[in-house]
């Protein structure tokens, strides 16, 4: 039977419950325990698919096509278990399910209430999400005291009563603010947070105390006394400069041992060799590159969380320090491409909406003309096709019908039909609801032999995750290929363009993909596409300034001649 670790948060949000849960899961996994993680989100949205990235951050896509919370990305990066749609659910999904049951008459005419119907549904969703795991870590979104979180907290309280004593463990993540005028960490917010948790019937077994400095022994004893938590279970969770140090930090304070003891699990000792090697590689780079990430959500970098992590993973495996420069594409529209001058590579990620599109196209044109390594992801591939069509094919005003429905050259259009991971035919139109209606999840991509993409992956076919509605218009593919663009990846049916590239005789590294490779990158293995991209950036950075300038001037001359 699965045992449960419930992770809650107090005082403020964004303390890092997801990282804490993932780090504990990583420790348990190194001890030979089968572990999974669930994220319970209290918001009423059915999923985050249509939420503003500035409010929610990144939408992480699972292999089975679920649009989920970004914490699931952390889970997959820290442990080997792949997440599914059952690893993340929201208040919206719970109420939707309960209302469907009420309409069917499942409650036999009874009055449907938060207790027991909503709480029972939450418990059912939790049990359905654990699969065959020995331990399921369940992260409750929000903070203790939020009205939205109360049904979830009540549900896990009930589970702790209904299950055997050693089958549940409660971990509470809280904040210890440092007051500089007093010169000390203040424990009162933590005391009140735990008091509120205990008032609803939950006694935490472990406290993770977030702070910017180590927790002094006296404060540790004080917290233990006032919260009814054993002193050794009050753990200092200090700020670190990279998240991959956290498993070792928690292991040093015996968090995994405390949890195993609480759950009555006998397991082998933790082996952190892999994590220590990752941290060592991060802290001892042999190279350094600057990457321009040109997007529209750059004011909230969590909008590109998996992408920034994938670049860091590639840096680990190429012994390279990655400096990511987040550049607002609207600034390029207003002030030009001068901000790209000292970059060693350019990346245009996915996105939605017309705002900032022309700035991204300008960045792509700069990368192509100056032979700077370029990686386009999702929208970044679509805009590369638009840029190439306008400037190489001379198709003036070529565009995507997403941004210009009346474009004379619709080089990208809405997908109307495709097959999902189960082989079912999906059909969409411009009038279809936005939520959950994209081409989502893992899709097979066939790689053409003798292309850079095939060389990078070393395989004939790969499975990568998608999240988009628009695709390259097949009518324009012959013109694109005739002008020198290589269509290096196709969908399993061979009718959708998945990858494009320029020949290396023309450009050293210009690759773009319709899918999101960042969703499958892990610190342990990296991702072949990102590793190759960083290698290309290292090579470009290694050129002398004179060589770079000559390369750029020659390419500009060639481009000007071809335009004439």
Swiss-Prot record:
Keywords: ATP-binding, Glutamine amidotransferase, Ligase, Magnesium, Metal-binding, Nucleotide-binding, Pyrimidine biosynthesis. CTP binds at residues 13, 146-148, 186-191, 222. GO terms for molecular function: ATP binding; CTP synthase activity; glutaminase activity; identical protein binding; metal ion binding. InterPro entries: Class_I_gatase-like, CTP_synthase, CTP_synthase_N, GATASE, GATase1_CTP_Synthase, P-loop_NTPase. GO terms for biological process: 'de novo' CTP biosynthetic process; pyrimidine nucleobase biosynthetic process. Pfam families: CTP_synth_N, GATase. It catalyses: UTP + L-glutamine + ATP + H2O = CTP + L-glutamate + ADP + phosphate + 2 H(+); L-glutamine + H2O = L-glutamate + NH4(+); UTP + NH4(+) + ATP = CTP + ADP + phosphate + 2 H(+). Residues 1-265 are annotated as: Amidoligase domain. Pathway: Pyrimidine metabolism; CTP biosynthesis via de novo pathway; CTP from UDP: step 2/2. Its EC number is 6.3.4.2. ATP binds at residues 14-19, 71. Mg(2+) binds at residues 71, 139. SUPFAM superfamilies: Class I glutamine amidotransferase-like (SSF52317), P-loop containing nucleoside triphosphate hydrolases (SSF52540). It comes from the Bacteria. The keyword Lipid biosynthesis does not apply. Gene3D superfamilies: 3.40.50.880, P-loop containing nucleotide triphosphate hydrolases. Allosterically activated by GTP, when glutamine is the substrate; GTP has no effect on the reaction when ammonia is the substrate. The allosteric effector GTP functions by stabilizing the protein conformation that binds the tetrahedral intermediate(s) formed during glutamine hydrolysis. Inhibited by the product CTP, via allosteric rather than competitive inhibition. GO terms for cellular component: cytosol. The active site is at residues 378, 516, 518. Homotetramer. NCBIfam families: PRK05380.1 (NF003792), PyrG (TIGR00337). CTPSs have evolved a hybrid strategy for distinguishing between UTP and CTP. The overlapping regions of the product feedback inhibitory and substrate sites recognize a common feature in both compounds, the triphosphate moiety. To differentiate isosteric substrate and product pyrimidine rings, an additional pocket far from the expected kinase/ligase catalytic site, specifically recognizes the cytosine and ribose portions of the product inhibitor. Catalyzes the ATP-dependent amination of UTP to CTP with either L-glutamine or ammonia as the source of nitrogen. Regulates intracellular CTP levels through interactions with the four ribonucleotide triphosphates. Belongs to the CTP synthase family. This is CTP synthase. It comes from Nitrosomonas europaea (strain ATCC 19718 / CIP 103999 / KCTC 2705 / NBRC 14298). The gene is pyrG.
């Amino acid at each position: 039977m699965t045992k449960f670790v419930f992770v809650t948060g107090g005082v403020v949000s964004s303390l890092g419950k997801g990282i804490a849960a993932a780090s504990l899961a990583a420790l348990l996994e190194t001890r030979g325990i089968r572990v999974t993680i669930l994220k319970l989100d209290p918001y009423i949205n059915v999923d985050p698919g249509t939420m503003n990235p500035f409010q929610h951050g990144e939408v992480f896509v699972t292999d089975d096509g679920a649009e989920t919370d970004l914490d699931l990305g952390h889970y997959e990066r820290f442990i080997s278990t792949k997440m599914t749609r059952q690893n993340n659910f929201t208040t919206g999904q719970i109420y939707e399910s309960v209302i469907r049951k009420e309409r069917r008459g499942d409650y036999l005419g009874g009055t449907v209430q938060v207790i027991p119907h909503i709480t029972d549904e939450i418990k059912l969703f939790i049990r359905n999400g654990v699969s065959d795991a020995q331990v399921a870590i369940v992260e409750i979104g929000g903070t203790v005291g939020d009205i939205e979180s109360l049904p979830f907290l009540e549900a896990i309280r009930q589970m702790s009563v209904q299950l055997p004593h050693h089958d549940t463990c409660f971990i509470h993540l809280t904040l210890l603010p440092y007051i500089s005028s007093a010169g000390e960490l203040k424990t009162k917010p933590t005391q009140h947070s735990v008091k509120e948790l205990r008032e609803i019937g939950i006694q935490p077994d472990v406290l993770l105390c977030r702070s910017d400095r180590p927790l002094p022994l006296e404060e540790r004893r004080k917290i233990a006394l006032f919260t009814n938590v054993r002193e050794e279970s009050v753990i200092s969770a200090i700020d670190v400069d990279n998240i991959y140090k956290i498993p070792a930090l928690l292991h040093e304070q015996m968090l995994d041992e405390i949890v195993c003891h609480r759950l009555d699990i006998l397991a082998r000792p933790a082996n952190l060799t892999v994590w220590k090697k990752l941290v060592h590689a991060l802290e001892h780079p042999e190279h350094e590159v600057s990457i321009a990430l040109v997007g529209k959500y750059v004011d909230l970098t969590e909008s590109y969380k998996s992408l920034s992590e994938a670049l860091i993973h590639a840096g680990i495996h190429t012994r390279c320090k990655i400096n990511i420069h987040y550049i607002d594409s609207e600034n390029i529209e207003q002030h030009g491409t001068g901000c790209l001058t000292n970059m060693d590579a350019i990346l245009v990620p996915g996105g939605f909406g017309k705002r900032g599109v022309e700035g991204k196209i300008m960045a792509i044109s700069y990368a192509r003309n100056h032979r700077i390594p370029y990686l386009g992801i999702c929208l970044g591939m679509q805009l590369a096709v638009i840029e190439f069509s306008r400037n190489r094919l001379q198709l003036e005003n070529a565009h995507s019908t997403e941004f210009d429905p009346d474009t004379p050259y619709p080089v990208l259009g809405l997908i109307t039909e495709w097959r999902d991971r189960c082989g079912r035919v999906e059909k969409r139109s411009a009038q279809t609801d936005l939520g959950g209606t994209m081409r989502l999840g893992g899709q097979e991509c066939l790689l053409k032999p003798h292309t850079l993409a095939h060389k990078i992956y070393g395989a004939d076919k790969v499975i990568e995750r998608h999240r988009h509605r628009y695709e390259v218009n097949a009518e324009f593919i012959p013109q694109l290929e005739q002008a020198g663009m290589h269509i290096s990846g196709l969908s399993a049916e061979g009718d959708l363009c998945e990858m494009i590239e320029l020949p290396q005789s023309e450009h050293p590294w210009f690759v773009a993909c319709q899918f999101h490779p960042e969703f499958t990158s892990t610190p342990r293995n990296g991702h072949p596409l990102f590793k190759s991209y960083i290698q290309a950036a290292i090579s470009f950075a290694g050129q002398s300034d004179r060589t770079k300038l000559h390369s750029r001037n020659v390419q500009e001359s060639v481009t000007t001649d071809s335009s004439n």
